[in-house]
Amino acid sequence: MHVLILGGGVVGVTSAYYLARAGHQVTVLERQPGAGLETSFANAGQVSPGYSAPWAAPGIPVKALRWLMMRHRPLVLWPRLEPRLYAWLTRMLANCTEEAYRRNKGRMVRLAEYSRDALRDLRTETGIAYDHREKGTLQLFRTRKQLDHVGDDTRVLDAYGVPYTVLDPAGCIAAEPALAAVRDVFVGGLRLPGDETGDAHLFTQRLAALCESLGVTFRYGTAIARLHHAGDRVTAVETADGALLRADAYVAALGSYTPALLRPLGIALPVYPVKGYSLTLPITDAEAAPVSTVMDETYKVAITRLGDRIRVGGTAELAGFSNALRGPRRETLARSVQDLFPAGGDLDKASFWTGLRPMTPDGTPIVGGTRVGNLFTNTGHGTLGWTMACGSGRLLADLVSGRAPEIASDDLALGRYAA
């Protein structure tokens, strides 16, 4: 079977890898000159099944109002006359109940754990290297209130058998020794030893090369104009230069840009771009830098070691498809890393980046078939595209191939929004 994958980010490329391994002829269309050059380029670097949780959670509406008042706020909302944004926010608010949070977090942890295992298998099979470490995540709490609410997450972790340890300040320092220099800043933490870190861009580029060795064709610099369809079948992809490309099956993995492509087919995909930012700074003192990932719970900022660099990622900005770099967001990221690892890296030499995360209202990606028989989606991963990429690609390959998936997947498909 010939499969056309639309999008060459980490999700599209992992989909290509598993489909090629399943014996399919695969072509990837990507508008950029290479793989992984948009949302996958400089993300936070976490592979964090244990930290997988929906943003829609009990108490979030009140917290969001408080965040919007903070100087270094983790949430930024630019007022816009955009009906799709407010429809998306309304759906998200509807998921801020205890029942919905448990259901959505359970789905996310299921896929993320599967994906982490798939990544480990892939690494064993191929020897792929991407500045990865297997040293866990430390969610760091600055306030007693944050620590007291840790049970909201550990109950779901217990249900899915995800290992964790709740730590006092001494335990946090044992996990991340550089925190000893700022021990008065935090009161405790939650350590997730099964989490990993790695450079998603480097991984995507190297996996694309492995895909080519399996016969996958990459057509870079190819922008997609629209899908042609007849009845319940896609018949072709029309590119920006007017070419028509045909296949037996099609996979939409265009991140935040997927809904606009599918809308003319009558498919309403509840995915909205949530803008994130990152700083990447060279390490100046290895002993003063993080060992793995530290998640600053107050500012919702992840600080990750990637080889000889520190990646600082965070912020949720609702600003449509704007890619403008905004100084206040840089200040928030800098504040977090300066608070926790003041001597670890050189901020004067930091690179500043932004990307658009494709978010769903319930936090769970949309992986599976659609009402158009030969069209599949693999999008909506939000902040967890890197965490969930391998599992989503492997799951998608099973679904396209007509094989029984290795994990429950009906509640990951678009149909859950019709339920």
Curated annotation (Swiss-Prot):
<comment type="pathway">
    <text>Amino-acid degradation; D-alanine degradation; NH(3) and pyruvate from D-alanine: step 1/1.</text>
</comment>
<keyword id="KW-0560">Oxidoreductase</keyword>
<keyword id="KW-0274">FAD</keyword>
<dbReference type="InterPro" id="IPR023080">
    <property type="entry name" value="DadA"/>
</dbReference>
<dbReference type="GO" id="GO:0005886">
    <property type="term" value="C:plasma membrane"/>
</dbReference>
<comment type="function">
    <text>Oxidative deamination of D-amino acids.</text>
</comment>
<dbReference type="InterPro" id="IPR006076">
    <property type="entry name" value="FAD-dep_OxRdtase"/>
</dbReference>
<dbReference type="GO" id="GO:0005737">
    <property type="term" value="C:cytoplasm"/>
</dbReference>
<dbReference type="InterPro" id="IPR036188">
    <property type="entry name" value="FAD/NAD-bd_sf"/>
</dbReference>
<keyword id="KW-0285">Flavoprotein</keyword>
<dbReference type="Pfam" id="PF01266">
    <property type="entry name" value="DAO"/>
</dbReference>
<dbReference type="GO" id="GO:0008718">
    <property type="term" value="F:D-amino-acid dehydrogenase activity"/>
</dbReference>
<dbReference type="GO" id="GO:0055130">
    <property type="term" value="P:D-alanine catabolic process"/>
</dbReference>
<feature type="binding site">
    <location>
        <begin position="3"/>
        <end position="17"/>
    </location>
    <ligand>
        <name>FAD</name>
    </ligand>
</feature>
<protein>
    <recommendedName>
        <fullName>D-amino acid dehydrogenase</fullName>
        <ecNumber>1.4.99.-</ecNumber>
    </recommendedName>
</protein>
<comment type="similarity">
    <text>Belongs to the DadA oxidoreductase family.</text>
</comment>
